[in-house]
């Protein structure tokens, strides 16, 4: 068996597990137009203060672009190499859903009245541009394309595997979750509920994407540890660890940027990692958020079969336990309405307004 070999027929599947992931993912389709946003507009204009709007604006500047870059990775880094129908179906489904995310985040920005110039403003901030520049270093696979499986070198195979770790493990699986955490503190406290619904559904998607692609990573590495030009497990491990550390560092710089305006406030006391009563950010501190992304990065490493490298203290468990259920559960309790957000189309009947207002 080989993930890199194509097949001239649809069935039998070589890797039915990837078809199953596609099937589950496609039953969870959604569109941004299904999310009511009128309360968010009122919150933005009348309920949020200047600090909160400024905080969210800094996040929004890179929010859409982050998923544009992830979607591009599926088309340029993954699909050119993996030809089997069940694998391309899974990847194609994931890539298509990134398009939904891009449109949803854009829908949010435009509903709030933000100008189109917002989409390019991230280029003015070193901390945001550095995140994009880093992943672009891994985006050029022209030296591999067209070689054919039999001509791939050890370095080529390690490049493919490291790219999956970077894009799916630490971009989708860690950096996006950092953004989700910063955004979710608002709907968890009664603000921006439409934004919260978009983020909640995106979490479901990105969890499936991360888990599906990391499973592919493990199968690919296992298949290529022997034979001609084998992957060197110790070399790949060190590469993945290096990527994890560098991407966590980039995300920490972004977190510092988002909180920079408030650096003189007590929430940024480097000696205090615990929640403080901050009325603008509901107790979320840069320290807790940085601990959280390290916690998430370790979980992604564990899923790949590697040991944790951050080993957080004083947080041996999730530093943001209020988000635990939203990130790890397949069906989430909607904190904003206390209703299920399992949005599988096969189980949805009637209009969305009827669903939201249905008695429990």
From Swiss-Prot:
Cofactor annotation remark: Binds 2 iron ions per subunit.
Xref: SUPFAM superfamilies: Ferritin-like
Binding site for Fe cation 1: 67, 98, 101
GO molecular function: metal ion binding; ribonucleoside-diphosphate reductase activity, thioredoxin disulfide as acceptor
Active-site residue numbers: 105
Amino acids binding Fe cation 2: 98, 172, 206, 209
Enzyme Commission identifier(s): 1.17.4.1
Any one GO biological process: deoxyribonucleotide biosynthetic process
Catalytic activity, reaction form: a 2'-deoxyribonucleoside 5'-diphosphate + [thioredoxin]-disulfide + H2O = a ribonucleoside 5'-diphosphate + [thioredoxin]-dithiol
Alphabetized UniProt keyword annotations: Deoxyribonucleotide synthesis, Iron, Metal-binding, Oxidoreductase
Name of one Pfam family that matches: Ribonuc_red_sm
InterPro entries given in the database record: Ferritin-like_SF, RNR-like, RNR_small, RNR_small_fam
Domain of life, source organism: Viruses
Cofactor(s) this protein cannot do without: Fe cation
Oligomer status and interactors: Heterotetramer composed of a homodimer of the large subunit (R1) and a homodimer of the small subunit (R2). Larger multisubunit protein complex are also active, composed of (R1)n(R2)n.
Family stated for the protein in its record: Belongs to the ribonucleoside diphosphate reductase small chain family.
Function: Ribonucleoside-diphosphate reductase holoenzyme provides the precursors necessary for viral DNA synthesis. Allows virus growth in non-dividing cells. Catalyzes the biosynthesis of deoxyribonucleotides from the corresponding ribonucleotides.
Protein name: Probable ribonucleoside-diphosphate reductase small subunit 376L
Organism for this UniProt entry: Invertebrate iridescent virus 6
